[in-house]
A protein has these predicted regions:
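Terminal or standalone catalytic/regulatory effector modules within metabolic enzymes
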Residues: 24, 28-48, 286-462
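C-terminal helical cap(s) of enzyme catalytic domains, especially alpha/beta-barrels
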Residues: 238-260
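Glycine-rich phosphate-binding active-site loops on the catalytic face of alpha/beta enzymes
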Residues: 110-113, 177, 225-242
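Catalytic cores of alpha/beta
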Residues: 92, 151-158, 212-227
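Hydrophobic faces of well-ordered beta-strands that scaffold small-molecule active sites
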Residues: 1-7, 13, 35-39, 71-78, ...
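Conserved, mostly hydrophobic/aromatic
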Residues: 8, 110, 173, 226, ...
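Surface-exposed amphipathic alpha-helices with a cationic face
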Residues: 60-68, 121-131, 188-199, 250, ...
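Active-site beta->alpha loop and helix N-cap motifs at the rims of alpha/beta catalytic domains
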Residues: 41-161, 177-180
Length: 462
């Protein structure tokens, strides 16, 4: 799958890319014969409303029109969060699937950062009910040194078996490593084990980021173990915090029994067009470099650049090295959730607070709620002392139930909000309000501003 136009944008530009700017590159990619694209979801849903003053639904419609009716257009969803950072109730989860089907998407890749199967069950049912293909995800990574108890091949295969036992409907499965830290031997053992558990015709994919510099090695291990598909991106959004490059992977497979199904010369041409399209966009230095420290301080490529952009905005980028070094501590004590949105943000926020305010002086709201169980069950129990701190500061008890049971229906509240502001209560508008809240309302009221980072002051839009 070509991830250039979703995860590539998210990992390199913090998802802030205007649709007209990349369309020539999309045309060139279609001409190159690519038929499977990541087209939206993840941070590329909210970011279009937040920073581009565009509708993500309009972007998806345009994407489909460009690639034709037969291409597989895939988006990313976060289980019960769907494409929001906050948890969404059942009616909004259903509406997510309905709207993404309506606006031309084919497949939804769907993950839960805690690998809590409960958080995947309902969304899986609604995705398939609306005629979309469901690519269920098990999130993977390597733990920081000294952490034991989860994130082993055995743990992932136990999660996979539970998916099967609970009869979660899916069409394919992806092992998703957003921090790029799962070591290649672990990748091999996990894919090899999954092949033994799953029916022979099950399509298995792997997704990674090249932040640590191991992306190609991970893919080679997965291919050796029997994986069916990998995710690649094209320059200028390949490597570093994004996915390995088409050409790099093509080169790595020379002399093996495997090849990639694309025309080399046409991919080169598409890459040149893409580079021209994106030449004015500001590329944070950390987005295109290998950051070896991430191997022991897991931070997803898609979150690293978003966080550094935020730190640039508030003039605290000088704290980044200390925050990265603090990450192992918050992972170790927080229950070993996978470092992928939204848990990666919980980790980063807590690490930032530990650096800025003093270690564990303040439990951030989301990290606190996570260790208390409000986002689901963590892979291992969080540290008891951290749980006590969270109970005290959040003034909440430990929760063992299903997070969905805590949420009131979202459609009535969103409808009231639209009516209060004289806006039409279309299903699209309802979903925008539910998933984007105040910034979604600003967009619908015509009050949003474009905030896309480009190279020169004259081309930067604010």
């Amino acid at each position: 799958m070509d991830t250039s136009f979703r995860d590539g944008f998210q990992s390199v530009y913090g998802a802030r890319v205007l649709t007209p700017d990349f369309l020539p590159a999309l045309d060139a990619s279609v001409e190159a014969g690519i038929t499977h694209f990541e087209a939206g979801g993840g941070a590329r849903f909210q970011s279009l409303f937040f920073y581009c003053n565009e509708s993500a639904f309009d972007m998806m419609d345009t994407f489909r029109a460009k690639v034709g009716p037969d291409a597989n257009l895939q988006t990313l969803a976060r289980g019960i969060n769907v494409v929001a950072l906050s948890q969404q109730p059942r009616d909004i989860i259903d509406l997510h699937a309905k709207m993404f089907k309506k606006h031309g998407m084919t497949t939804i890749r769907n993950f839960d950062a805690l690998n809590d199967i409960r958080n995947l069950q309902y969304s899986a049912e609604r995705i398939t009910a609306h005629g979309l293909k469901h690519e269920v995800v098990i999130t993977i990574m390597d733990l920081p040194p000294g952490c034991e108890g989860a994130h082993t091949p055995e743990f992932y295969l136990e999660r996979l078996q539970l998916l099967l036992d609970k009869e979660v409907p899916f069409d394919s499965i992806c092992f998703k490593d957003s921090s790029g830290t799962a070591n290649p031997r672990k990748v091999y053992a996990t894919i090899k084990g999954a092949r033994k558990i799953l029916p022979a015709d099950t399509h298995i994919r792997i997704h990674t980021h090249d932040t640590v510099g191991c992306g190609v090695a991970q893919y080679l291990a997965a291919i050796e173990a029997g994986v069916d598909g990998i995710d690649l991106a094209k320059n200028p959004v390949s490597g570093g915090t994004s996915q390995p490059d088409f050409i790099s992977m093509w080169h790595a497979l020379k002399g093996t029994d495997y090849t990639l199904d694309f025309d080399f010369e046409k991919i080169l041409t598409a890459t040149e067009v893409f580079e021209e399209c994106m030449k004015d966009y500001f590329v944070p230095p950390e987005a295109r470099q290998v950051t070896a420290l991430i191997a022991v301080s897991p931070m997803p490529g898609g979150a690293l650049t978003a966080n550094t952009m935020m730190m640039r905005d508030i003039k605290t980028l000088h704290l980044l090295p200390k925050v990265i070094k603090e990450l192992p501590e918050v992972v170790r004590l927080g229950g070993f959730g996978t470092s992928v949105t939204p848990v990666s943000q919980f980790y980063f926020q807590q690490a930032y607070a530990n650096v800025a305010l003093g270690r564990w002086k303040k439990i951030t709201p989301d990290y606190g709620d996570m260790v208390l169980g409000y986002f689901g069950q963590t892979p291992v129990r969080p540290d008891p002392e951290i749980v006590k701190l969270a109970e005290k500061q959040r003034k909440k008890a430990i929760y063992h139930g299903d997070p969905l049971d805590l949420l009131e229906p979202g459609i009535p509240a969103a409808t009231r909000k639209l009516e209060e502001h004289g806006l039409p209560s279309t299903e699209e508008n309802i979903f925008i309000i539910a998933s984007c809240e105040g910034k979604g309302l600003d967009f619908l009221l015509g009050q949003s501003k474009v905030n896309v980072r480009k190279q020169s002051a004259t081309s930067q839009l604010n």
